[in-house]
Structures are given as structure tokens and as C-alpha cells.
From Swiss-Prot:
It is found in: Nucleus, Nucleolus; Cytoplasm. Residues 123-141, 181-247 have a biased composition (Acidic residues). The modification N-acetylserine is found at S2. This is Nucleoplasmin-like protein ANO39.
Amino acid sequence: MSKEFFWGDSLTGTKKEVKWNPSLDDEDDFDNLDSDGIQHFLFLKQAVLGANAKEGERNVVEIETENFDGDNVKQPLFSLKLGLNESSPLDIGIQPPVTFILTAGSGPVFLSGQHMIEISADDEEELEEDDEEEEEEDEVEVNASPDLPVAKSKKRPLSTSDGTAKKTKMAKLDKDADKKEDDDEEEDDEEEDEVMAMMDDDEDDEDDEDFEGGEDDEEEDEEESDEDEDDEDDNEEEEEEDEDEESPEKPLKTTAKGKKGQMNGTTTAKGDNKPKAKAKTDTKLVKGKAKKKVLALDEIKGKLQESSNVPKKEEKFKNYVRSAFHISEAKKLQDLWGWFRASLQK
């Protein structure tokens, strides 16, 4: 522990020396401390020439103290002159004993600084105990003073019981307050858990919607491809009909046209050919679907990169790939998932 105090003194023509050597005998606050447990330091900060100094007179101040070896040392500290340099900043820390001497001039020269007292940890505890004992003694003296009314001394035990009751009540209030804080914290934690659970549910719903949206897109693509194949089959049928009309068997069709009664037969013949065309179309669709199932991993990766509705969770991703690309092999699914997860981290 350390304490700091302001320090100041002056040197004049009649007071040429100032000694600084504080001791425990002069300190009322440290009566019970050892001299080894306390240290004094003086930090000089400023030297100022007084207003009554003589013009043109040089004032020289010398310091006398002990060095590390315990030898006596004398050294000029500063020099002041009115009109030239009337003050001098200082930054010197010294320990007692110290003597300041005005070796030249008549002053006045004013010294100022900081007096710091360092107290060891053991002595600090003793000092605190002494302070507590003094406070208790003061309270006892006040209570035992004859100047106090008798009624007050009689009421003291009651005040003590009241104080105990107040302390008990305060302790109970503190306990209730702590319990209430704990309850509030638990409620806050529960609310946070509920919010997090709701957020997770929302994310799952979004992933499900994305997955369903991806399946719908795939089904639409398949329907469009089927429609395109149907259109191609219809075009092929029309071309075949055109070729039949241009073939050498044209007189037979002309005869059929001449006889109106046989139009139904001709229509029936054309109708008999249509189911065969439809069967061809179904065969082509089956072949087209079979080709779709056999997709290379690079093609699947390309489609996944183009799609914006791919789920970002492993299980949903695998379900999506199974449904969209008809892949059931666990190794391929795991490879695709590893590639997709790496692409997300880029």
C-alpha cells in the first residue's frame, strides 16, 4: 500500500538549509509499525524563485544525501536568476536523509514535490487491524459516556434486535431477488430454445419446398420431352401418309374416294393404323426414360449446379438425387454429396 502527500519548503537568506528526514516518531498514523516496514520517498517536481528575489542575483541550491554505498554526497542541484530563469522543473526521486542548502544568493527559493510512503503487506494488515480496534474503542466510549441519556442506553438491545430483524429481512429479500433472477434467466433460455426450434422448422420447410419444387421441375421437363416426342411421331405419321398417297397404289385410293359408301372403310383402315403408331410412341417414351436413368456423374453435377433448389442437408440431398436422377447406389450418392458440400464451402 502507498500513500502520497504534497511536500513544500523554502530557502531564504536567514534559512539557508532545509532537512528532510521523516521518522515514525513524527507519524501518529504509524505508531505500531516497524521502521523496516515503511519507506519514505521524496519526488522533487519544481523550484521557483520568489517575488522578493534580488535582480541580477544568482541563487544556487545544493543537495546533500547518501549514495548507494552509504557515503555522504554533495551536488549542486539547480541555479535560478531573476529575469533569466525564474523557475526550474525537476524530476528527482530521493530517500531520506536529505538536506537542501542555498549556497549562493539570498532567495527566496521555493521547493515543491510529492512525499510518498510505501507500507509492506504485513504492516498494512496491522494498520487495518489497529484502525478497526480504534473504531470499536470509540464506539464503546460513546456508548459508555455519562452525558448520554439513560433511556438511550436501555434501548440499545432493542435496536440490536431490530437490526437483526432488518438484516434477516434484507437477506430474505436478497434471496427472493436472486431466485427471481434465476427464474427470469430460465424463462429467457426457454424462449431462446423455442425461437431456435421455430427457425429450424422454417429451414426444414424451406428445404422441403425446394425439394418438392425440384421434383415438379423434373416432372415438367419429362412431360415436355414426352410431348416433343409425340409431336415427332405425329410428324413421322404425316410423312408416311404423304408417301402412301404418292405411291403407285394411288388408283386404289382414287377408287375408294369415288365410292362414297366405302369412305367409312377407308377411315376404318386409317384408324387401324393409328394404334400401331401410338404403340411406337409408347416404345420411344420407354426408351427415352431408360436413357434418362443412365446419366454420368459429370452430367448430374452439371444439372445440380444449374439448379437453385438443391437441398443443403445430406439426407434431403440424397432423396432429391434418388428421385430426380434415379440413382440408388449408396457410393454414388455419397460421392455426389461430398462434391456438393465442397462446392458450397468455396
